[in-house]
């Protein structure tokens, strides 16, 4: 697969699943299961529910994707509150 052979969409992380998987709701309302790209894992960029992300989706399987970037909020304010225990 070529480097530019993907569909790039914006979405919001709805749920964090085990094994660095995330359920992301795209702008058009579709849900995809997405994992973190290698650079985000390498630099330990945290993605939490409520974060706005850019997802690369393969044209061959539109239900799975790769989180390529976490975008910041335009206001620069605090991030959404986390639920659950913190490690």
Swiss-Prot record:
Role noted for this protein: One of the essential components for the initiation of protein synthesis. Stabilizes the binding of IF-2 and IF-3 on the 30S subunit to which N-formylmethionyl-tRNA(fMet) subsequently binds. Helps modulate mRNA selection, yielding the 30S pre-initiation complex (PIC). Upon addition of the 50S ribosomal subunit IF-1, IF-2 and IF-3 are released leaving the mature 70S translation initiation complex.
Region called Disordered, residue ranges: 65-87
Keywords for the protein's UniProt record, in alphabetical order: Cytoplasm, Initiation factor, Protein biosynthesis, RNA-binding, rRNA-binding
Superkingdom to which the source organism belongs: Bacteria
One term of GO molecular function: rRNA binding
Localisation: Cytoplasm
Gene expressing this chain: infA2
HAMAP family assigned to the protein according to its UniProt record, in alphabetical order: IF_1 (MF_00075)
CDD domains (alphabetical): S1_IF1
Pfam families xrefs: eIF-1a
Similarity remark: Belongs to the IF-1 family.
Entry-linked InterPro entries: NA-bd_OB-fold, RNA-binding_domain_S1_IF1, TIF_IF1
Descriptive protein name: Translation initiation factor IF-1 2
Subunit structure comment from the entry: Component of the 30S ribosomal translation pre-initiation complex which assembles on the 30S ribosome in the order IF-2 and IF-3, IF-1 and N-formylmethionyl-tRNA(fMet); mRNA recruitment can occur at any time during PIC assembly.
Keyword RNA-binding: yes
GO CC annotations on file: cytosol
NCBIfam families xrefs: infA
């Amino acid at each position: 697969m070529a480097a530019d052979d993907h569909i790039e969409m914006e979405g919001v992380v709805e749920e964090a699943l085990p094994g660095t998987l995330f359920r992301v709701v795209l702008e058009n309302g579709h849900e995809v299961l997405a994992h973190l790209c290698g650079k985000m894992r390498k630099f330990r960029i945290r993605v939490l529910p409520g974060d706005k992300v850019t997802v690369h989706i393969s044209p061959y399987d539109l239900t799975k994707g790769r989180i390529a970037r976490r975008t910041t909020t335009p206001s620069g304010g605090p991030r959404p509150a986390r639920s659950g225990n913190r490690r």
